[in-house]
Curated annotation (Swiss-Prot):
This is Nitrate reductase [NAD(P)H]. GO terms for molecular function: FAD binding; heme binding; molybdenum ion binding; molybdopterin cofactor binding; nitrate reductase (NADH) activity; nitrate reductase (NADPH) activity; sulfite oxidase activity. Residues 1-65 are annotated as: Disordered. Keywords: Disulfide bond, FAD, Flavoprotein, Heme, Iron, Metal-binding, Molybdenum, NAD, NADP, Nitrate assimilation, Oxidoreductase. Heme binds at H563, H586.
């Protein structure tokens, strides 16, 4: 049976990550002080219209009905912040909500709220959670300096300041749902890649907008009639964009649309009772209800009345639905972009299932089976058309059930509906148990409905096929059976969703057919174990370390000690999906080795339900919302295990023809890196659209504040016939300009020097009074770090004997520092070995590391000696290990290899 949907009421208390209750206080104004005028009081608009002489209508009577909803939503928001991801971009002054899902990397800022978070706030979306579509940097604007020019086919061209717009024209205020034409695009990208990025199902938001009617402004300026050629009204923004060789963002609407009082088109200057935020077009933008967001120009500067539609690059090369056979090359070659019949203006009908949410598991027990489960979601249509019906099917469309609808808005006086509505349907849990999927479709008053199957187009726009949630029966918790729900995709570039799984299965070998059956069937195929994401997250320690790579789950616990990079290389990713990072740093051989540790597949579900329907003990109905993570203040230590931290290149110096010193500034100038002596970090960069990660040991001291130094050898192209392309990361670093941002992740490594002769190796303590240190090439950096730590502590009496091998004398890294230390400290002895010497008087060894060299320059093996080595594997095995064994070293226990 169906039950009506009510606006949910929420307290201001949310469970924090640690289980404690946190209270969020309302944030009256989250705008940056960099734009001080944002907080100025807006001049009052006239109570009666003064622009056109028309009688004011009753259309404003209900404009204050949403104040309580706005205040409630703002009261549940954490403050917006200056996100570190924006630090090196032109948007580094814009404050943003940290929970927003970024869809295009760091810049430009394109984002949507997590779907559960969006639905939690109900009808009115708080401005910081409203989806954002930016084509470039956010323009910096001041209220008092801004003006909007009206020109073209008008009798009285004018330029209106913001104060004039607000005081000389009546203002309208009403709720409008904005939708990006790319909403749900990722579903299209899973079928075939479009030219657009991965919008999820939250590219939709609703706010209360206040602004000046466009028709009033145009009438004030004396807009010409159609008979005199006024066919189109063009809008142009302020941002500088690259499209078409350089342009502003611009578009247009038909004259009839612009002048239609039923259309409620406004020049918006307030959102939810406050001035627009920078991301949403401060100080003024177009609001065109019922249209796609791409027509609502932000940072509005010009309104031009013309005969022809806008000739702007973005008007023609964006927001089009081309036939499915037309790809990007065909569209360009055959000029499809310029065919007017393919332009998008009004939104189409669409609906989405939001409850059950993605990754939800509904336990099947005596409690849940005795009461119905409520399915929920949203629906919208365009052009002011009312959504009249929403239907659910659980058997592929053979039978449909009509849902209850909740329309929180009132239509305007012309009967137009500008906002989304919410639907709900109560179903029996046993019916869900027998269903393979749940699908939804909506209808509007023009009897438009959603197609069953996805219709691909090159821009991936207006996707409105049935929204399907897959169900699987699984073992949920404590042996309990549950129903796992999976949405088609997750937004952005994150992995997850049943479409990704089915795509992987379609391209997999015949050996994976049993897995395919297990995913497509509502009952588990026990030949392949399935685990939820919440179960994987529990295995994040040395006692049990699981990782996810390409949807497969691997138990790497028994490989921790054998991993060449040390246990930390695994533990830093334990309990997570590390697909991208694994692919970035591992060879095909390593990928094959991983298969030995495969234990099952990911069903991308978590046990704790995100839905209020599954609260077993009557918890608050806010329990379906994922806990809001508190934004912690910047720590004194920069490194956060498992996280990538941004650093900025602030200095670089050539130490030789192929050696560079790079100085990277930490996120805060009062931070230390937080890297234990002997460990290293991954340096992360995107090169040719792929993640590249390389391990480096900083040469700066562990207590250096505000930055870290890396000494890097640059492997140029064609400098080594074995590696004709050179080093990918080192050449990238060498090419970077000052100010570039790189990400660092760590700590990593299995060796840690804790001071005064003490080490932890794979967590086991070791001690030595004397250290035999053997390094080759860039392998000197971790040994250099240990030397530095010992010399820095006056009470550390550990003796050090260094043998350092290189190809030539010019290749010796950090020689000046090593020689200086050796002169000043008797406990440090340094000996160099070079393959070839080009000058006379070379006082060190020539050739390779030999037994005779080691016997002369490092101590004989004994209980108080440890050997440290770092270099090429061939050097370690042939020159170090074999010769140390001849010198009475127990290489299993006394040789530490970085």
């Amino acid at each position: 049976m169906a039950a009506s949907v009510e606006n949910r009421r929420f307290t201001h208390h949310e469970p924090a990550v640690n289980g404690l209750v946190r209270t969020f206080k309302p944030v009256p104004n989250s705008h940056r002080s960099d734009s001080p005028d944002l907080g100025r009081q807006i001049p009052s608009s006239p109570k009666k219209q003064v622009a056109t002489g028309e009688d004011s209508s009753s259309e404003d009577e209900n404009e204050n009905d949403y104040k309580e909803l706005i205040q409630k939503g703002n009261g549940e928001l954490e403050p917006s912040i200056l996100d570190p991801r924006d630090e090196a971009t032109a948007d580094n002054w814009v404050e943003r909500n940290a929970t927003m899902v970024r869809l295009t990397g760091k810049h430009p800022f394109n984002s949507e709220a997590p779907l559960t978070r969006l639905m939690h706030h109900g009808f009115i979306t708080p401005a910081p959670l409203h989806y954002v579509r930016n084509h470039g940097p956010v323009p910096k604007a001041r209220w008092e300096d801004w003006s909007v020019e009206v020109c073209g086919l008008v009798k009285r061209p004018a330029r209106f300041t913001m104060d004039r717009l607000v005081t000389e024209f009546r203002s309208r205020e009403f709720p409008v749902t904005l939708v990006c034409a790319g909403n749900r695009r990722k579903e299209q990208n899973m079928v075939k890649k479009t030219i657009g990025f991965n919008w999820g199902a939250a590219g939709v938001s609703t706010s209360v907008w206040r602004g000046v009617p466009l028709r009033d402004v145009l009438k004030r300026c004396g807009i010409f009639s159609r008979g005199r050629g006024a066919f189109n009204v063009c809008f142009e923004g302020a941002e500088d964009l690259p499209g078409g060789g350089g342009s502003k963002y611009g578009t247009s609407v038909k004259y009839e649309m612009a002048m239609d009082p039923a259309r409620d088109i406004i020049l918006g200057y307030m959102q939810n009772g406050e001035r627009l935020s920078p991301d949403h077009g401060f100080p003024v933008r177009m609001i065109i209800p019922g249209f796609i967001g791409g027509r609502m120009v932000k940072w509005l500067k010009r309104i031009i009345v013309t005969t022809k539609e806008s000739d702007n690059y973005y008007h023609y090369n964006d927001n089009r639905v081309l036939p499915s056979h037309v790809d990007a090359d065909v569209a360009k070659a055959e000029a499809w972009w310029y065919k007017p019949e393919h332009i998008i203006n009004e939104l189409n009908i669409n609906s989405v299932i939001t409850t059950p949410c993605h990754e939800e598991i509904l336990p099947i027990n005596s409690w849940t089976t005795q009461r119905p489960y409520t399915l929920r979601g949203y629906a919208y249509s365009g052009g002011g058309r009312k959504v009249t019906r929403v239907e659910i099917t659980m058997n592929g469309g053979e039978k449909w059930r009509v849902c209850a609808l909740d329309h929180p808005e009132k239509p305007n006086k012309y009967g137009k509906y500008w906002c989304w509505c919410f639907w709900s349907l109560e179903v029996e849990v046993l019916d869900l148990l027998g269903a393979k999927e749940i699908a939804v479709r909506a209808w509007d008053e023009a009897h438009n409905t959603q197609p069953e199957k996805l219709i691909w187009n090159v821009m991936g726009m207006m996707n409105n096929c049935w929204f399907r949630v897959k169900t699987n029966v699984c073992k949920a918790h404590m042996g309990e059976i549950g129903i796992a729900f999976e949405h088609p995709t997750v937004p952005g570039n994150e992995s997850g969703g049943w479409m990704a799984r089915e795509k992987n299965l379609e391209t997999s070998s015949d050996a994976n057919q049993s897995l395919k059956k297990s995913v497509s069937s509502p009952f588990m195929n026990t030949s392949s174990k399935m685990f939820s994401m919440s179960e994987v997250k529990k295995h994040n320690s040395a006692e049990s370390a699981w990782i996810i790579v390409h949807g497969h789950i691997y138990d790497c616990t028994h490989f921790l000690k054998d991993h060449p990079g040390g246990a930390d290389s695994i533990l830093i990713n334990a309990g997570t999906d590390c697909t991208e990072e694994f692919d970035a740093i591992h060879s095909d051989k390593a990928k094959k080795m991983l298969e030995d540790y495969r234990i099952g597949e990911l069903i991308t579900t978590g046990y704790v339900s995100d839905s209020p329907n599954s609260t077993v003990h009557g918890a608050s109905n806010t329990s379906h919302l994922a806990p809001i993570k508190e934004i912690a203040p910047l720590r004194n230590v920069a490194l956060i295990p498992g996280a990538k931290i941004p650093t900025k290149l602030v200095y670089k110096k050539s130490l030789s023809h192929d050696v560079r010193l790079f100085r990277l500034a930490l996120p805060s100038d009062d931070q230390v890196l937080g890297l234990p002596v002997g460990k290293h970090v991954f340096l992360c960069a995107t090169i040719d659209d792929k993640l590249c990660m390389r391990a480096y040991t900083p040469t700066s001291t562990i207590d250096e504040v505000g930055y870290l130094d890396l000494v890097v050898k640059i492997y140029f192209k064609n400098s080594n016939p074995r590696f004709p392309n050179g080093g990918l990361m080192s050449q990238h670093l060498d090419s970077l300009p000052i100010g570039s941002v790189l990400h660092v992740k760590g700590p990593l490594g299995h060796v840690e020097y804790t001071g005064r002769g003490n080490f932890l190796v794979h967590g086991e303590p070791k001690f030595a009074k004397r250290l035999a240190m053997v390094a080759g090439g860039t392998g000197i950096t971790p040994i250099y770090q240990v030397i530095q730590a010992i010399l820095k502590d006056p009470e550390d009496e550990t003796e050090m004997f260094v043998v350092y091998a290189n190809r030539t004398e010019d290749d010796i890294l950090l020689r000046e520092e090593l020689d200086d230390w050796a002169k000043k400290h008797e406990k440090l002895k340094v000996w160099y070995v070079v393959k070839e010497s080009k000058r006379e008087g070379w006082e060190y060894s020539v050739g390779y590391i030999r037994e005779s060299i080691l016997r002369e320059h490092i101590p004989e093996g004994s209980d108080d000696v440890l050997a440290l080595a770092c270099g090429a594997p061939s050097m370690i095995e042939e020159a170090v290990r074999l010769n140390l064994e001849k010198m009475n070293y127990d290489t299993k226990n006394s040789l530490i290899i970085f």
